[in-house]
Amino acid sequence: MASPFPPSSAVRPRDAASLLIYRHAGARVQVLMGKRRPGARFLPDVYVFPGGALDAADARFAADALARRAAAGRAHMVLEPQWLQALAARHGLHAAALLRAALREAHEESGWRWPKADLPGLDSSGVRYIGRAITPAQSPRRFHARFFAVPDERMQQDPHADGELLDLRWVDVHNPERLPIIDVTEFMLTELQRELGGQRKAWPLLSYVNDAVRVRRLPISP
């Protein structure tokens, strides 16, 4: 797979996060995706998962979540699942901030939101960590994106939301080829299948070297 981005001077990648909202349709697995607007600066007219850059509010929210857990005598656990505990042990609040960014962006872009009752302590039961990817050095807009996944029944639809993504649809993870997607998206769809099938023992980092994709499988790290 070659890089889909045009040559440009290297810029530092921004921390970002995406959320794969998935559902089971019989024996098949489907993921919610939408098309970026034609005038978007990054990947216009391409189908993506809801997601975006980490912002200062995400870090503040994560700090508040940790404070609530400290008050409850659980300061050592930023988040519940074992893999998120590992992220938190290595990077502290950064792990919680990334998950919060994924949840926030999902609401803003698709209208699907995390239950309000679960937000104060950032109860993340049911969430899976899929992997991460770093945009090629030649891209004019670069991201160090982490990908999380959650079943649709764990989310709520906001009837008043006007999502930023167009043409929201459920896409079969086994057959996304008819839509314009980039290699990172295709890769994460495959990783979701492997995760749900219990076939993974490590978490991937996808990056680009000399315009070619490189995948390393590493211990959990955000």
Q: How should each PLM-predicted stretch be described?
A:
Residues 1-222:
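N-terminal leader/linker segments that precede catalytic domains of diphosphate-processing enzymes
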